[in-house]
Amino acid sequence: MNKVVLAGLALILVRDCDIGGPRFHGQIKGTWGGDNAGLMALDTTAHIHIGCTAGDTKQAIVADEQGRFDTPGRYNITLYPVARGPDHPARFTGSTDGHVMTLTVTLTDTAVTLGPVQLELGKEPQMGPCPICRKPGR
């Protein structure tokens, strides 16, 4: 075979491959933990902590076909040691392959952004001095 035919076959094979590897899509569930961050995802909501701050989504977190998500919710950046409020409107954005997640919290009424943080499914969050709530909405 000549080189042009081989190059054409190689391009066809590469086009049909998923070079980025498998991606997770669908509803995110379970406990995800990292350094000074955690996420507990249930059927209808999720509870997120980054440092001494926390918030909840208004719905389940669902990743698209690329493993990306963008979910609305509320977030309190003045939570610890005494919750002073208010809860700010927020967007919880990121991506996952189903085992590792990158998460960013953006308050939509201020210029505050937390993260990105990296979380692992099934890993206990390592929160340091700030406690983590065990139930969303708490």
Residue ranges of model-derived segments:
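Bacterial Sec-dependent N-terminal signal peptides
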Residues: 4, 11-27
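Mature extracytoplasmic/luminal segments of secretory-pathway proteins
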Residues: 14, 49, 127-130
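Edge beta-strand at a domain terminus
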Residues: 19-20, 55-66, 100-138
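Tryptophan-anchored aromatic micro-motifs
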Residues: 21-40, 71, 103, 126, ...
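Residues that act as N-cap/strand-start positions at coil-to-secondary-structure junctions
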Residues: 26, 33, 42, 55, ...
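N-terminal glycine/threonine-rich, aromatic-flanked beta-hairpin/loop signature
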Residues: 35-77
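Short, cysteine-centered beta-strand-loop-beta hairpins and adjacent loop/turn segments enriched
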Residues: 53-55, 77-86, 109-113
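An anionic, turn-rich surface loop/hairpin at beta-sheet edges
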Residues: 71-95
